Amino acid sequence: MTAQAHLDRIQTINQGSFYTPDSITRLVYQMLLNAKIDIKDYVLLDSSCGYGSFLNLEGFKQNIGADIDKQALQKAQKIFKDYAIAPLFLHTNSLQNVSREKFNILESSKLIIVGNPPYNDKTSIVQNHLKSIDSNPVDSQLKARDIGISFLRSFDILKADYICVLHPLSYLIKESNFKSLKNFIKHYHLLDSTIISSQIFCPKSLGFFPIVIALYERDNQGMDFDFICNYEFKTLE
């Protein structure tokens, strides 16, 4: 999949925009298959789809991609234009007025959310001079210091049956971040995981940090911080 090329440095920082190599999307797909999920019965949603890397995944009832970045969506549409069944693309702010209806998903549909949602701590001093606090509106119940946490909260509102996404490992292992996930951790538990390095996405960065490919399943028990403290995370061989 083509790397993101149309955003300047400030836009990239504000949107947390890094696009996902095929090797990572294959790991996500394999994680879903290993969980023995009958994917043909599920709608697949990537609510921050960029160029559509995760929409290449096959075998789902329908593939839907949404993004606030119109240029990225236009590129994605060109990439998929010759597909017999192309994904449904939606140009929208996925953190505003969040509902299944917004994404053309029935309340009765089984739903899997995948992707590499933006992550960007807007209160961090790192490159703070380039960050815009109010770059895009966010529903009040989703507002957080890091936009990636906002996305995870939005997945709970959408009541996805399974979620397989990339996000900083610190969302789970740092207790303050974990608690800031709010209702997400009440309704989901970690089913599988693989840790990778942020170097994959930003090799010229001033510093690297661990990212987890995390598979979550919705249930009535959720998870607490003790569960995470005792969880054995896997790494790439």
Indicate where each model-derived feature is located:
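S-adenosyl-L-methionine
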Residues: 78-107
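Flexible, glycine-/basic-rich loop-and-beta segments that form/coincide
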Residues: 208-237
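Class I S-adenosyl-L-methionine
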Residues: 1-77, 98
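Glycine-rich phosphate-binding loop signature in dinucleotide/nucleotide-binding domains
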Residues: 35-39, 104-109
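Mobile active-site "lid"/loop adjacent to the S-adenosyl-L-methionine
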Residues: 120-144
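Short catalytic/ligand-binding loop motif for oxyanion handling, primarily in non-cytosolic enzymes
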Residues: 54-55, 120-124, 171-176, 223-224
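Internal, well-ordered alpha/beta segment that forms a basic, Gly-enriched binding/recognition surface
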Residues: 112-127, 154-155, 164
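Conserved Class I SAM-dependent methyltransferase catalytic core
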Residues: 141-200, 214
